[in-house]
Each structure stands twice: as C-alpha cells, then as structure tokens.
Amino acid sequence: MKKLLIHFFVLLTVMFSKNLTLESRFNPPARELMDVEIIGDIMIIPGNLDGYDFFDISDPTNPVHISNIEVPMGNRALSGFWVKAKDSVAYFSSRTRGEGSAIVNFNDPSDPVHIGSLSLDGAGVNNPSLEGLDILENMLAVAAHEDGVFIFDIDDSYNPDLNYMFECGNAWDVAFIDSNHIAIGNGEYGLILLEISCSIEPCSQTTIETEGAVKDVEYRDSSLYVAEGSAGIALYDISDLESPILLDQYDTEGLANKIALFGGNKVAVSDWEDVKILEWTGTELELVGYKKTGKRTMAIAARDSFIYSAEWQHLQTFRFGDINDADMDISSWDIAFPALEMGTSDTFELLIENNGQYPLGLIAPSLTHNDFYVVDFPEYMEPAESTAAKVSYTKSNQNASGIMQISTNDPDEPHIFVQLVGNYEGGIIGIDAPEFSLPIVANGTGTFTLSDHLGQIVVIAFFAPG
C-alpha cells in the first residue's frame, strides 16, 4: 500500500495562563450572524438571513433570546451586516443595494419596531452598498464602499439628516476619533485619518498603506486597532494624526474580520475558524488566549471578561480568564483529504493541546466510518502539553465521510465532533474538472468557459437563494 504523509505543524510560542472557557452555545433564529452590538444589558445581532435578534445579557454567561424582527425586502428579510445603537434605537446597514439600511426602535426589546431607513436623497449616489457604522453623540457615520463615507445628524433618531460626505476607494468601516475626526478603513487602499470640519479648506487628511485589506477599525485612547483580513491585526498610535506610528502587526493566521476591545489593552478577534485574544504589552501584541470553534466566526463583541462570538449558525459565549480545569484545544474541526488512488492513504496531523491547569484525560476517539483510523492518540496530557495525533484515510470503493468523536474531562467541552471527509462521487480537490460553460451574472458579461482559463488561478462565486 502506497502511503502519503502530509505534515501540518502548528507552532505555539505562548504558554497560556489564561484562555477561553465556553459558557454557552445557542442557535438563534437569524442565520449567518454578521455583527454584535451591546448596549446596556441588550445585545443585538443581525443576520444575513432571517432577520435581527435581540438578547438579554443581564446574566452575561447565558444570553437569553428575547425577539427576532424581519424587515421585509421582497420575498425575504433585509440582510444585516453591521449594527450600532443609541438609547433605544438601532441602525442596521446592509450590502443590499437600493434598500441597504433599517432603523429599529427597541424600547420594548420583546417587540422591536421597524421605523424606517437612512435617506440618501440628494447624495448623488446610486444604490450604495452600506457597511460599517459608528456613533458619537448625535452623529452616525456609515461606510459605503466605493461611495465613501456618510455622516448623519441623529438628533431626531427616527429621521437622520445627512450632513457630510467623503469619497474614497472602498470604505469598509469607519470609527470616530473625536467629534471632528474619523478613521476610515478603506479596504485594500489602507487607512484614512480625516478631519471632517475645518475653518480653512482643505481639511487635514492622512493616508496609511496597510499590509492587508482593512475590514474593521476600533479606536481607544489614541490607539487605533485595525483588522486586516489575512494580514491579521495592526495597532497604531495616532496621538499625532498627521504622523501615525505603527506599533505592531500580528499575523493571526486566519481571516481577521472584526474586533472588539476590552480590559484596557486587550482585543478579541473573530478570525474565521477561531477566536483569538491579543494583549498590547506596551511593546508588542501578544497572543494570550484562543479557542478553535470550527464554526465560522464572523463577528465578535466583548464586555468585561465575556466574549460573544457570532458565527455562521451559532452564538457562543466565552469567558476569558484562568482555567483551573483541563482545557482541550484542537487545530481543526474539519479534516478533508485530497483525491487518492484506490487503496492509497493520506494522513493528517491533528494538534491536541491542554491549555488548562489540570491534567487532561482522553478516551480513544470513536469514528463512524471504517475508512478512517487514528494512531498516536494520547490518553493523558499534562497542563500546557501538546501532541500530534495522526488521522489517516485509506480510499476504498465507498463514499467516505464521517465523524470523529473526542471525549475528555474538559468540563466545558466534554465531547468534540470532528468532521471527516474522504473521497466520494463528485468534485474533489485534486481531480481534473470537466469542461463547463456558465453565464457571467456579476462583475462582467458573457460566458465563462473553463478551457479558456487553463493555467490560471480563478475564483468563482456561486450564489443560491437563502
């Protein structure tokens, strides 16, 4: 039998004294959760599908779902990508062009009411796609990709008045620095620090080139934290707006999409497949905690030591702090094997860690398909110990997919279920694709034919109704 080995090494340079403990997991009515806003004891989470959810977090360990509101848009609910709230009014933005916002009164969180939407009459824009939001006093700032940034006066919270516009390349997010300055996350074009009102034109403007495309910006006490997608997290000192200083850049290894600040010098990161906690030590950003969720972490919020992870289908609540018990982390919740010849094998190294302060006891994993097997699986791990178990797959004439259940004495996650995917009938990474032609419905015209693009790297997005 020919055996192929692929080694995956994950190097950790930090021995955690603190980490993330799972407090609760909830599957809310809204799907594809995109943002989290906390105002008092109310938490608001918009979904790309099926509306916006309201939670009571007076018990921070256990969010209680209060209500869901769907804002009508044709035959579905208006999607929500960002939300900001003031008093009892929430403002939602959406990438849906033409109907891209909603204003909701949640004075009674059990019965939120759709009031209206942001008016862009007179702005001279055509069907903008709205993204990040921020509120300071009576001002609401809205990022709008290629249409730049809009600022509204929200003294009349139900009828915001557009009073400022700034054009830029690809505004993903915006944050108030003070009442006269904003920071714009300008996507692949970097950052803009902008004066929005001045006695002598032009107002001051500082542009910063970033390592990655900016997805989220958060400001606190002269520090600007920036989520840059695949480039991780950057931290700038912007006490002098005309001469910002890059303090550090941390590669999170995932896709840093949204961030939340807490504890004075810490930042929680939604990093696609995991949640990471970074701490500014005064000299560098240091990884001080993480939890691999395996559930597409899309957005994040933090209050005190509690971290709320909004994911594709779940809301998970974590507590950041000392873990006196055993605490297991694994490097992947999904293991997929490439195309193989009949009878050949492939092996994936699964990193297992005990990030708690008590020994971790493990039971040999159970597997639901006999084409998969595990070797070098530990039975016992000391605190701060890590090891690699080998998960192998041998191709047979069966369609191969299954579940590996790992059971331990980790009290918050006693059972973890890892998805295993071998070879099956259909498209598999590593096999030749059949010739096809499809009509191009966005970002171009005509027909896409596979043979016209041989030797090229091509990304194709397929969309279906929700």
Question: Where are the predicted features?
Answer:
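Hydrophobic h-region of N-terminal signal peptides that target proteins for export
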Residues: L5-S17
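Feature marking well-ordered beta-strand scaffolds used for ligand recognition
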Residues: K18-I323
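Feature for long, exposed domains in two main contexts
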Residues: D322-I428
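N-terminal "domain-start" segment that seeds a small globular fold
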Residues: V421-S451
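Short active-site neighborhood of thiol/selenol oxidoreductases, capturing the structured segment around
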Residues: F448-G466
